[in-house]
């Protein structure tokens, strides 16, 4: 498999936790000590929540307001809708008030507010602030009632009409663009992309594998969908530096290209626990007492808008089920395939799963019994056969002696005949 890239930087800092963990000796990459510590510590807060939101708060950010205003468009796209509507209304009302004040000042300086004055006014029928405000609204929104209008008496009034028209177009373009960008954000697409509640570790093709399941609830496809994962845990460097959240890549097939998936029906993502895996030295007992978090990410382009979306979730160590597999969800009907999402999060236990680490398994410290290696579908098949035999009256053997002509070693090596699962009614 590919190499593991480790990011050598800290994301969160906690001096108190750092001093406390610096004195601890934890095995399997969780510390510098050599002795194993199986007393579970208090679990840290989840870095990425189940719904994909990052559990992070930024404090003591210098010049935060100025930085957000410098990128005002992104700020408007990211803020909540209620604040977006407030900005939308304020932008128009303030511009109307500003230009209404300008037209009122022009009328005041020209003497148009004096009813006894004779002569041509700069803006006809503008003899109060209310009239100037209404004229500003009519100019910017191009309503044009025809009752008030600018004349050629004052060039400054003509210039302000032109200037307000340009400003109004800029405000319209900015606000409408921000609203459309906010509506087109693929964030809500994540509501129809789901991860399984638990990850599992089980044997697959003779190797221990970490697996989790992803599904797409919509019929529209996710274009160029691909997955990646990272393991977050604290560690202490050889120099004694405490890193509270060290990020380690988990290989899900990036080098071979199998990280790209065709997400039409639910798919199980597989991470082979090999010598490059951060889980290579962890046994079931180590997993049960470990304190780490696996962040899983699904990325792809929304078919309708071609915009990239990212769906995230995470699994803590206590959310990884050792010796379990996922129940099947895809069933073949007569002319189509059916996906049963009621089984999406369900798992079943595989009793013969080795409890040792992948390293111990590779070094053949654990002998896997072939005689007890039943897959879920074969268990179902055997159960159905026993029920049929009991209904047909086939007598069961009561002898406990082993016949002399049967070789138990050869019998254990004979694999079970696979039985494909083709109908939901069979299970």
Swiss-Prot record:
Changing residue 305 to P: In LQT7; there is loss of function when the mutant is expressed alone and a dominant-negative effect when expressed with wild-type channels; channel trafficking and assembly are not affected. The chain crosses the membrane at residues 82-106, 157-178. Heart, brain, placenta, lung, skeletal muscle, and kidney. Diffusely distributed throughout the brain. Residues 1-81, 179-427 are cytoplasmic. S-nitrosylation increases the open probability and inward rectifying currents. The keyword Ribonucleoprotein does not apply. Inward rectifier potassium channels are characterized by a greater tendency to allow potassium to flow into the cell rather than out of it. Their voltage dependence is regulated by the concentration of extracellular potassium; as external potassium is raised, the voltage range of the channel opening shifts to more positive voltages. The inward rectification is mainly due to the blockage of outward current by internal magnesium. Can be blocked by extracellular barium or cesium. Probably participates in establishing action potential waveform and excitability of neuronal and muscle tissues. It is linked to Long QT syndrome 7: A heart disorder characterized by a prolonged QT interval on the ECG and polymorphic ventricular arrhythmias. They cause syncope and sudden death in response to exercise or emotional stress, and can present with a sentinel event of sudden cardiac death in infancy. Long QT syndrome type 7 manifests itself as a clinical triad consisting of potassium-sensitive periodic paralysis, ventricular ectopy and dysmorphic features. This is Inward rectifier potassium channel 2. It comes from Homo sapiens. The lineage of its organism: Eukaryota, Metazoa, Chordata, Craniata, Vertebrata.
